[in-house]
Amino acid sequence: MVSISPDGELFTLVNVFTVEPENQQRLCDHLAQVTEDLIRHMPGFVSANFHLGHDGRHVVNYAQWRSEADFRAMHADPRLEEHFAFCRSVSQPRQISCDVARTFRGVGEGGN
């Protein structure tokens, strides 16, 4: 389960991939498959969530790792070179590392 909390000590990444509409689902499927087969088994991986922009031109990945060092180790793994090359070939990726500042839930969802 994804835990989004300003009290968490997780390393959070938001990846925004700008794509041509014909590549949106293709990229999302690729990201999901690589995550299922390899990334989720790596040390420090917590979660990944993929979102398709209604405009057909964006895939957004919200990912969490136990630490930035765990994320960097994944990124340096040579088994993922083809994955990153594919992503760059079908999209313009933008990676943003974040700290969770605030979260809110609806009153009907257990929030105040």
List where the protein language model places each region.
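An amphipathic, aromatic/His-enriched active-site/gating alpha helix that lines ligand/cofactor pockets
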Residues: Q33-V46, Q64-S97
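Short, surface-exposed ligand-recognition loops at beta-strand->loop->(often short) alpha-helix junctions
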Residues: T18-L31
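Short acidic-aromatic low-complexity motifs
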Residues: S3, P21-E22, H41-M42
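Short, well-ordered beta-strand segments in beta-rich or mixed alpha/beta enzyme
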Residues: F11-T18, S47-D77
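Residue-level signal for secondary-structure boundary sites
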Residues: N23-Q25, A69-F71, G106
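Glycine-rich beta-strand-turn "strand-cap" elements at beta-sheet edges
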Residues: M1-L10, N49-R57, H83-N112
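Short, flexible segments with low predicted structural confidence
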Residues: L10-F11, L27, M42-P43
